[in-house]
Amino acid sequence: MTQQSDSTLETVGDAIARHLADIGVTVIFGVISIHNMPILDAIARQGRIRFVPARGEAGAMNMGDAYARVSRSLGVVITSTGTGAGNAAGAQVEALTAGAPVLHITTQVDRQFMDRDRGAIHDVPRQSDMLKAVSKTCFRMWEARSVHSALSAATSAALSAPKGPVSLEIPVDVQREMVAVQTNQPAPRIVRIEPDADALNTLA
């Protein structure tokens, strides 16, 4: 079995930063946490995306929401596990009611502790249920190899009608795992709603 060289591998955090930059993301709003440092360190290393820190997660989500509305493009927000994600929830409801395309990247405890109520730092039982209540849809990245497919699905969902905020949970241990470098990620696939011709004729 042939092993890949270090130059062809990168952390999931680096893959996330690279993917977002490749699809045109130039700014991310958020709050720095020990749980999202692998992603934010990668953003700083690559230097292709500006990170705008907020004093609280609600403010970060408001900024991401406003950015999405004004720019008519994807707003991206990054928060931390549990309380951090919860702090963004109220502002995310505002984005949901406005139909603003926001990607909410939040984190999760290591997979061995997820959904087990073991008291891991920042862990909140049923975090996914909370996020589903304030999101158009919610994804969870279980494996490093799904990093690009998960990001593509989440960004496409946010930008496809009806637009709205989409949450993506990424466990801390997954962020540190290694994956093959993939460059030049394609733009998100936007699913367009085609009107029914007969219905249009009836209305006309």
Residue locations for each model-derived region?
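N-terminal alpha/beta PP-like core and its mobile active-site loop of ThDP/TPP-dependent enzymes
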Residues: 2-204
